[in-house]
From Swiss-Prot:
Similarity section: Belongs to the Syd family.
Protein's UniProt name: Protein Syd
GO cellular component: cytoplasmic side of plasma membrane
Superkingdom to which the source organism belongs: Bacteria
NCBIfam families: PRK04968.1
Membrane found in the keyword field: yes
Function according to Swiss-Prot or TrEMBL: Interacts with the SecY protein in vivo. May bind preferentially to an uncomplexed state of SecY, thus functioning either as a chelating agent for excess SecY in the cell or as a regulatory factor that negatively controls the translocase function.
Bilayer topology term: Peripheral membrane protein
Main location: membrane
Subcellular location: Cell inner membrane
Keywords for this protein: Cell inner membrane, Cell membrane, Membrane
Amino acid sequence: MSCLPALDKFLQNYHQAYLTSLGELPRYYPQGEPSVCIQGEFHADLDQAVSWQPVKREVEGSFANVEHALELTLWPEINHFYGQYFSAPLLFDSEWGTGELLQVWNEDDFTCLQQNLIGHLMMKKKLKQPPTWFIGLLDEGDKMLTINNSDGSVWIELPGEIPTQQLSPSLAEFIGALSPRIAPPVKHEELPMPALEHPGIFASFKRMWQNLFGKR
């Protein structure tokens, strides 16, 4: 079962929750990055939050280059989850805690996603672990949410470790169990990680790595 209907519904509920509770669209710090998602004026040189809404992509994002580079067939849900919309990260509440689903802010963000996905999968191969790919963060970035590439199930994963806790048998069921979380926009400080420079998707992963390794 495709996760796209569940993602469509969550996006609709997400924006309706903000409109109902706050009377406004959700806001996000783009850190100078343009996007078709931005509603209203945008000034790249001003450090301010923008109102946004998801925009359906005219051409679906493709991961064929990633599959070719790694000689690996990816679980097809990756195209539905990351290739259908431009969107800011989506905050959620769940029975497993609070977190966020990663999404793609613009085409540059999509390129960064592909590059970092390749890096993640190469690391899994080097560690002789089954391939996974990430969809979000849990518990303020302390844990990754990943997909088992062999069957599409959703797991909690710590970098460098094999996932041990399954959350859902499918991405569609997982998204269906989430509730939108209403919160003010948070500006995330840039960390010195050159490989993850783009402020869209991987600002979230910068926080995760800082939280994980800053505690050791």
